[in-house]
C-alpha cells in the first residue's frame, strides 16, 4: 500500500475551470487583454485567447512585453456578432449557431484560425443544404418515375440532379477531391430517402442475356468500371473515330429497352465539372459497384470512346516511358497503346473476356487513359518544366509503374513550394510568403520618417512619401542635392543644362561635391534602403529599381561627356558665381546658398 500510485483524471475539473474563467471575464477580473470589434470592447485573458486561437498565439507570442497594462487588439475583419459567439465558445465550449450568424461565425473563425469552429459551421450548413436538396430531388424523382417517358430518362435524371445542385452554393466551392466527402449532398441524396437508394438496388444477374445486355454500355465494355472524377477532356484527344450508324442504332435501341424495363439504378456518382480540359483523378471502382444498366451521360458521347472493343486476342503491353523523352515521343507512344487497346477493326459487340484478361484490360486502359490525359494539348498537367520550376521533374514520377491500380494519392503535382505554417496559404516565392506572414503577426515594418505612418509593404511607403515631397522633387543629376525651386537647377537658364545645379554647372566635370551624395535631403538618403528600408533580396521588384538607377547613371555620364569644359572655363565660372553670390568671394564653396533651403 505504501508504494501504490494512481493517475486519476477528474473530468468535472474542466467544466469547473471554464466556469470560473468565464465568471472572471464577465466581471473583468484579471483581464489582461481587450479586443475591440466594431467599437465594442471584449475583455478576456491572454492565456485563454492564446490557447484557443492560433492567430492570437502568433500575435501575442511575437510581441515583446513592455508593460503590465492591458493589451488592446483591434479586429477590423470580423463582426461583433460573430466574435461574441466565438469568445463565448472559448470560455464555455458551447457554440451557439443559428441560420443568421453562421456565416459571420465561420468567417471570423477562419480569420482567427480556429478549425474546429469552421468545421462545425460547415457541418451546420451542410445539414441545412441536405434537407432542402433531398426534398427537392425527391419531388423531381417522383415525377420522373411516374409520368416521364422512357426515352427521356437520362435528361430527366440530369435535370433532377442539377436542380438539387443549383440550390447549394457551397458545392461549387469544392476544390480538392480529397475533401469531397465533406459536402457530397448529391451522393447523400441517393443514399437517403430517394426511391432508388442502395437498399433498392437489384443484384447483378449472371445469365448470358444479362452479359450481352451489359456489353451494350460503353461504361462496362472495354473501358472497365472506372469512376472518373472531373473529366472534361474531349474524346477527340484519344484518337477515336465515330462508330458506324448501325452501331449507334443498336445503342439507341438498347437504351430504349433498358428505359422501358425495370429501370436503372445510378451509382450516385458526382461529377465536379470545373476545368473543362483537365483530367485530374481517375480511380478504379470495385467491380461489384457497377450497375447492370447504368445510363450513358449526355455529356459523354458513346461514339467518342475508343476503349469499346472486347477482343480476346488483343495484346496488352504497356511500355514505361522514360522521363527524358520528348513530348512528341510520349504522345506517339500513347497513341500506339491506344491502337493496341482498340484491337483493329473489331466489332462493337464481342465475346466476353476471361476474368484475368478483363482485369488486365481495365488496368491497362486506366494507365493509357491517364497518360493520354497528361499528354493532351490543352491539359494543365502537360506544362513544360520551365513553368513548373523545380517541380517539373515530378510531373511523370507519380504515374503508376506497370499495370497497378490507381488511387487519389498516387497522382499529385505540387506547384507551390513555400507554405504558411499558420494557415493553408502557399506561394511560389519566399518574398510573397514573408509578406503574407505579416497578416498573421500584424507587423508593419516600413514607417514614414515624416509622419510616422506604418506600412506592410515598402513600395506603399515609398508612394506615401511622395505626398510630403510633391514640391521638392528638383534634384541635381551630378551632386544629387534636392532644391525647392526649379530655377536653382538650371531649368530657366539657357547657359546651363536641364537638371544641373549652378555649382555643378560652373564646376564642370572636375570634382563633384563631396557632400552631394550623402546629404540629408538627397534621394539616396531618403530611399537608400537603410534602417527599416532594408532591401528584400527575394523581391522581384528590385531588378526593375536597379535598371532605373542604371539609366539615371547613363544620363549623368552622357551629360559629363557633352559638357567638355576646360579648366580655365571652370575657374571663370567659379569666379562669376562667387561675384553673383550674396555671401561674397570669401564664402566657402562647400556651403549651400542661403536662398534655397535644404530638405530634412
From Swiss-Prot:
SMART domains: BTB, ZnF_C2H2. Residues 243-259 have a biased composition (Polar residues). Residues 533-555 have a biased composition (Acidic residues). Residues 197-207, 556-574, 591-600 have a biased composition (Basic and acidic residues). A zinc finger (C2H2-type) spans 418-436, 446-468. The modification Phosphoserine is found at residue 234. Pfam families: BTB, zf-H2C2_2. Functions as a transcriptional repressor for PRDM1. This is Zinc finger and BTB domain-containing protein 46. It comes from Mus musculus (Mouse). The gene is Zbtb46.
Amino acid at each position: 500500500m505504501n508504494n501504490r500510485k494512481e493517475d486519476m483524471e477528474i473530468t468535472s475539473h474542466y467544466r469547473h475551470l471554464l466556469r470560473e474563467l468565464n465568471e472572471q471575464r464577465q466581471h473583468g477580473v484579471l483581464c489582461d487583454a481587450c479586443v475591440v470589434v466594431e467599437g465594442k470592447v471584449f475583455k478576456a485573458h491572454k492565456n485563454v485567447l492564446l490557447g484557443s486561437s492560433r492567430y492570437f498565439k502568433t500575435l501575442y507570442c511575437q510581441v515583446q512585453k513592455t508593460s503590465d497594462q492591458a493589451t488592446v487588439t483591434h479586429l477590423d475583419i470580423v463582426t461583433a456578432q460573430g466574435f461574441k459567439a466565438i469568445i463565448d465558445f472559448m470560455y464555455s465550449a458551447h457554440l451557439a449557431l443559428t441560420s443568421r450568424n453562421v456565416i459571420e461565425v465561420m468567417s471570423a473563425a477562419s480569420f482567427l484560425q480556429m478549425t474546429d469552429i469552421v468545421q462545425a459551421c460547415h457541418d451546420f450548413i451542410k445539414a441545412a443544404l441536405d434537407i432542402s436538396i433531398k426534398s427537392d430531388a425527391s419531388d423531381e424523382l417522383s415525377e420522373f418515375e411516374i409520368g416521364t417517358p422512357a426515352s427521356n430518362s437520362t435528361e430527366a435524371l440530369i435535370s433532377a440532379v442539377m436542380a438539387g445542385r443549383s440550390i447549394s452554393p457551397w458545392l461549387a466551392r469544392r476544390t480538392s477531391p480529397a475533401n469531397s466527402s465533406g459536402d457530397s449532398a448529391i451522393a447523400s441524396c441517393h443514399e437517403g430517402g430517394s426511391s432508388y437508394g442502395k437498399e433498392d438496388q437489384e443484384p447483378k444477374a449472371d445469365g448470358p442475356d444479362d452479359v450481352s445486355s451489359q456489353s451494350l454500355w460503353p461504361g462496362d465494355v472495354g473501358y472497365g468500371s472506372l469512376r472518373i472524377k472531373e473529366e472534361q477532356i474531349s474524346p477527340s484527344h484519344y484518337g477515336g473515330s465515330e462508330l458506324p450508324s448501325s452501331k449507334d442504332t443498336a445503342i439507341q435501341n438498347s437504351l430504349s429497352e433498358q428505359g422501358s424495363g425495370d429501370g436503372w439504378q445510378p451509382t450516385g456518382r458526382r461529377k465536379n465539372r470545373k476545368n473543362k480540359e483537365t483530367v485530374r483523378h481517375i480511380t478504379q471502382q470495385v467491380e461489384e459497384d457497377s450497375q447492370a444498366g447504368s445510363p450513358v451521360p449526355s455529356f459523354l458521347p458513346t461514339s467518342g470512346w475508343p476503349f469499346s472493343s472486347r477482343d480476346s486476342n488483343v495484346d496488352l503491353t504497356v511500355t514505361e516511358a522514360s522521363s527524358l523523352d520528348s513530348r512528341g515521343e510520349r504522345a506517339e507512344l500513347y497513341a500506339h497503346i491506344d491502337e493496341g487497346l482498340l484491337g483493329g477493326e473489331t466489332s462493337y459487340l464481342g465475346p466476353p473476356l476471361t476474368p484475368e484478361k478483363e482485369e488486365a484490360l481495365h488496368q491497362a486502359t486506366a494507365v493509357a487513359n491517364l497518360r493520354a490525359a497528361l499528354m493532351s494539348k490543352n491539359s494543365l498537367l502537360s506544362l513544360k518544366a520551365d513553368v513548373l520550376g523545380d517541380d517539373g521533374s515530378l510531373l511523370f514520377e507519380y504515374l503508376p509503374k506497370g499495370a497497378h491500380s490507381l488511387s487519389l494519392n498516387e497522382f499529385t503535382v505540387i506547384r507551390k513550394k513555400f507554405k504558411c505554417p499558420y494557415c493553408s496559404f502557399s506561394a511560389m516565392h519566399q518574398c510573397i510568403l514573408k509578406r503574407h506572414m505579416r497578416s498573421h503577426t500584424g507587423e508593419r515594418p516600413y514607417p514614414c520618417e515624416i509622419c510616422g505612418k506604418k506600412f506592410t509593404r515598402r513600395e506603399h511607403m515609398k508612394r506615401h512619401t511622395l505626398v510630403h515631397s510633391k514640391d521638392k522633387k528638383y534634384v541635381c543629376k551630378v551632386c544629387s542635392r534636392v532644391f525647392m525651386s526649379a530655377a536653382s537647377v538650371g531649368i530657366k537658364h539657357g547657359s546651363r543644362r536641364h537638371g544641373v545645379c549652378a555649382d555643378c554647372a560652373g564646376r564642370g566635370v572636375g570634382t563633384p561635391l563631396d557632400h552631394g551624395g550623402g546629404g540629408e535631403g538627397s534621394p539616396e538618403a531618403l530611399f537608400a534602403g537603410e534602417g527599416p528600408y532594408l532591401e528584400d533580396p527575394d523581391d522581384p521588384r528590385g531588378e526593375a529599381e536597379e535598371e532605373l538607377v542604371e539609366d539615371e547613371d547613363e544620363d549623368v555620364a552622357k551629360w559629363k561627356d557633352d559638357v567638355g569644359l576646360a579648366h580655365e572655363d571652370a575657374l571663370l565660372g567659379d569666379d562669376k558665381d562667387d561675384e553673383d553670390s550674396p555671401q561674397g568671394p570669401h564664402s566657402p564653396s562647400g556651403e549651400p546658398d542661403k536662398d534655397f533651403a535644404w530638405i530634412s
